[in-house]
Amino acid sequence: MATLKDIAIEAGVSLATVSRVLNDDPTLNVKEETKHRILEIAEKLEYKTSSARKLQTGAVNQHHILAIYSYQQELEINDPYYLAIRHGIETQCEKLGIELTNCYEHSGLPDIKNVTGILIVGKPTPALRAAASALTDNICFIDFHEPGSGYDAVDIDLARISKEIIDFYINQGVNRIGFIGGEDEPGKADIREVAFAEYGRLKQVVREEDIWRGGFSSSSGYELAKQMLAREDYPKALFVASDSIAIGVLRAIHERGLNIPQDISLISVNDIPTARFTFPPLSTVRIHSEMMGSQGVNLVYEKARDGRALPLLVFVPSKLKLRGTTR
């Protein structure tokens, strides 16, 4: 069975582009030649959407999952990390024969009364929690967890990753490390920054003035890095919270005329496809974000099937991939 990923690889485009072309997204700005190539490949591989497969087979799904994304849909275009999570959800639902409804919180929830379970991707608002719990108690958070919530969760051990990056730099003889990151809530540090600051101070390699926080975008990374580099004294080793931010940081460093990694080095998180093609290629922590989506589906499905009462927290594996932005 062909998948969106198969089409994206053969067409040489991103998953986001394939998804938007096949869904006839009117806001997509792409060459007609590219659209035709994607459609031809989809036809050649006999790709069918999940709804088309259901019509063709006449199958009736016993399970129905509602996936709610607590962010703007545009974020999937700017950060492939989130698109990969959604792709993992969609692929696993197709594999298990589960009916799936996707929706974005800001667009409102669909009028669905009977669901097997709900996946919430990203940190939920209190209103979203209340709406979801009114539909079912089989809820799984993805890319977020909260001890004591009573719900399943699939997440990344970001605190461990932050410590791993600090230890890597310390083993290289670095005695001052900076941080450039984003925030999920205005004025509030995310777990990467919190763990970085706490562990870095313990190891005496972090200063308060070397912590920079903005948004999770390349433009934010660019602006923050420019501000940092404008100072006479700045850290020569950086932990950047995501690859998307790091792309902007790289641009600011290049514009400053600095050599990477001789003058300044950096490590980011996610290992998006673009990370291998930056200049120099990004050293980054690979996150199996597609697995986060598929494992979320598995937890909801397994709880519905077996009646498990205790909530589970699953951390997906990660691996530091050293490339050209570190010594």
Curated annotation (Swiss-Prot):
This is HTH-type transcriptional regulator EbgR. The lineage of its organism: Bacteria, Pseudomonadati, Pseudomonadota, Gammaproteobacteria, Enterobacterales. Repressor for beta galactosidase alpha and beta subunits (ebgA and ebgC). Binds lactose as an inducer. Residues 1-57 form the HTH lacI-type domain. One of its GO terms (molecular function) is transcription cis-regulatory region binding. It comes from the Bacteria. Changing residue 195 to T: Broaden the specificity of inducer recognition. GO terms for biological process: negative regulation of DNA-templated transcription; regulation of DNA-templated transcription. Coiled coil: none annotated. Keywords: DNA-binding, Repressor, Transcription, Transcription regulation. InterPro entries: HTH_LacI, LacI/GalR-like_sensor, Lambda_DNA-bd_dom_sf, Peripla_BP_I. Pfam families: LacI, Peripla_BP_3. NCBIfam families: PRK10339.1 (NF007665). Residues 4-23 bind DNA.
